[in-house]
């Protein structure tokens, strides 16, 4: 190869290799000046990988998550605060890690899981679609590569059971992480006498555990339900569609989804 230096004269030199995690350049060598120029050119062209840690520090994202939680609490829904979004992110990461996915895919699942409910800051109805639009707008202002942004946006737009479904490993893990977050302390209403069916169903769950068995390719949600608070019929009236969605998501990961309630296999 021929490189032109600052004085515009060709420089011919020995073979050198400059290696980065994305590129390998073979040059018929050059002065330190030329090598330095090439190396910096490579670094400047590389797209920065946005991390989950950086996303969690983003003030705009945190503001939307906070508003989403406030909106749904005021409307009488269960907890959708940062506690929920963090749990979904952690659970999605654990699923993909157990199934052997690479760190980058896991990182995208954590980001999408953390951001998945921001659309509730606009409105509960169509919150997945609103969230996808918001996420795309916010992430455009970061250093996240386009392909990664599209993956996150698609996941958010497809996470709701009424309109979406798993389309790739990231969305599959986030869907399972989201739909299996069933716990008593998600109930924001403290007045038991005014519980609606959603409150009763969540409050009735005294114990919930998600188990991931990559060897057997099985993801299991095991629940203990206080039937004096909520009947099994009530539970499945509310959650059956979500559990079926989890089954489809597990299929995308090449696994099966199983549900047990009070020791009995249900799904």
Stretch-by-stretch model annotation:
Residues 73-74, 78, 83-84, 97-212:
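Divalent metal-dependent catalytic cores for phosphoryl transfer on phosphate-bearing substrates
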Residues 32-49:
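Short, Lys/Arg-enriched N-terminal segments with co-localized hydrophobic residues
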Residues 37, 181-267:
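Terminal helices and disordered tails flanking the catalytic cores of nucleotide-processing hydrolases
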Residues 52-70:
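Short alpha-helical hairpin
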Residues 9-14, 19, 29-35:
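Short, low-complexity intrinsically disordered segments enriched in A/P/G/S/L with frequent Arg
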Residues 87, 91-95:
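N-terminal low-complexity or amphipathic/hydrophobic leaders
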Residues 1-10:
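Extreme N-terminal basic, low-complexity initiation segments
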């Amino acid at each position: 190869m021929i490189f032109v230096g600052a004085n515009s004269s060709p420089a011919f030199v020995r073979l050198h290799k400059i290696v980065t995690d994305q590129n390998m350049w073979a040059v018929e060598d050059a002065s330190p000046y030329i090598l330095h120029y090439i190396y910096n050119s490579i670094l400047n062209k590389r797209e920065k990988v946005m991390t989950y840690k950086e996303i969690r520090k983003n003030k705009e994202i945190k503001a939307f998550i906070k508003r989403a939680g406030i909106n749904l609490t005021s409307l009488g829904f269960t907890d959708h605060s940062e506690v929920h979004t963090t749990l979904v992110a952690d659970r999605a990461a654990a699923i993909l890690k157990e199934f052997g996915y690479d760190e980058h895919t896991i990182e995208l699942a954590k980001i999408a899981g953390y951001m998945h409910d921001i659309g509730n800051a606009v409105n509960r109805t169509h919150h997945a679609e609103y969230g996808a639009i918001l996420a795309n707008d916010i992430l455009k202002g970061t250093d996240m590569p386009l392909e990664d942004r599209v993956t996150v946006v698609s996941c958010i737009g497809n996470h709701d059971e009424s309109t979406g479904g798993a389309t790739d490993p990231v969305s599959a893990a986030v869907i399972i992480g989201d739909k299996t977050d069933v716990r008593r302390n998600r109930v924001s209403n403290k007045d038991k006498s005014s519980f609606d069916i959603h409150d009763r169903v969540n409050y009735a769950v005294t114990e919930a555990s998600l188990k991931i068995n990559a060897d057997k390719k099985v993801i299991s949600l095991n629940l203990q339900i206080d039937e004096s608070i909520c009947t099994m019929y009530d539970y499945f009236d509310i959650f059956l569609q979500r559990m079926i969605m989890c089954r489809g998501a597990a299929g995308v990961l090449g696994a099966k989804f199983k549900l047990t309630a009070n020791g009995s296999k249900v799904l």
